[in-house]
Amino acid sequence: MYRSVLALLFASVLLLSGCAVGQQTVPKEKSGQETNMDGAAFDRSDEEITYMDTKDNVIYLAGGCFWGMEQLMQSIPGVIDAESGYANGTCEADADYKTVCKGETGFRETVRVEYDPEQVSLDALLMAYFYVIDPTAQNRQGNDRGSQYQTGVYFTNESARETVKRIAEIERGRSEKFFVEIGPLKNFYPAEEYHQNYLEKNPGGYCHIPRAEMELFSRLRI
């Protein structure tokens, strides 16, 4: 039902817009952190932090396999750049695909999203994000299993913190379980070159996000 409501919301947005298309060191964390059944321990939004990315209009989104999330974000008008990488793990030496896939580094497959707020808001990007993920799933999305596929939204400034907290609180109230990590970005390392723009290079490649949903958001303007 909620997805239907969101679809109607985006359809309304499209009509209104004329369907225009327009490092820091961190302590080692356990990748299998225990949580309450409602996922409450995943909220770290009130942590004291020193931001590592000084750009205002950047958000980091972990939404399962980064191929699909990168492609989704790139399809949204107003997104300047989307880069696949590994976030909030142990150290740079562990930030490679083979090591991360072992599930022992704490790294999440994450997409760094830089956007133009004159064309698209952070609210809109987060709405698109929550539309395509399953927030009730821990350490998995689609057919992918492992701590590297844990969902999360990682902010880099105070303004984004408040927006993320507000949207996350709304989403948290929609189900009994909510396992999306909410907190500051601690580190981020770009993924290997062959992961960048993977679905653009391999149009028939695996993606846990339906193509129809990407097409929907390619006409998004808020």
Functional labels for PLM-detected ranges:
Residues Y2, C19-I222:
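Flexible coil/turn and secondary-structure edge motifs
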